[in-house]
Amino acid sequence: GNGTMSDLGSHWNDLPFWALQLKAPLAIEAFGPPAHPEIAPATMRAVYEFGARGDLPPVRVTWHQGDERPEIWKQGGIPQWRDGALFIGKKGMLLSDYGKHVLLPEKDFAGFTRPPQKFPKAASHHQEWIDACKGKGRPLADFEYSGWLTESNHLGNVLATVSDKKIAVMSGVNLSYYR
């Protein structure tokens, strides 16, 4: 099968893809245990490099799965949630899942006031899909958006299964593979 990356990658990587306005990565590297001929790895790491997007600078997004935890996570000081997305910035970090968000280190953000909600609460993705089929608007994660996200996830999986150190370089819709 396609493993955790294909199952949950579209949910967890949605957070950075949406917040950072990401599309096609410029390069991808993947690391993990020796590849299995039939299934995706249970433990892996995929590193995506994205170029500048308008006023947004280049950014690196790293997917960690299974025992492949980030070093900063292992050092402590970060809540040990089962799942989540950790945004690391110059002034601190944001740990998020779909139910909660924590600014870190917490002591540095003790007086922080959350900004007002910018977007209305969306209907369920099932309802958005039904409404779109009826011509009542577009879903938040339509194919124009989710195609880039899903393709990036699958490429991370593919690269994790083809060799020890993998780099794929994307150019628009063209993909080049280098060893």
Tell where the protein language model's regions lie, with residue ranges.
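Contiguous beta-strand/loop segments that form the cofactor/metal-binding neighborhood of enzyme cores
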Residues: 1-144, 148-179
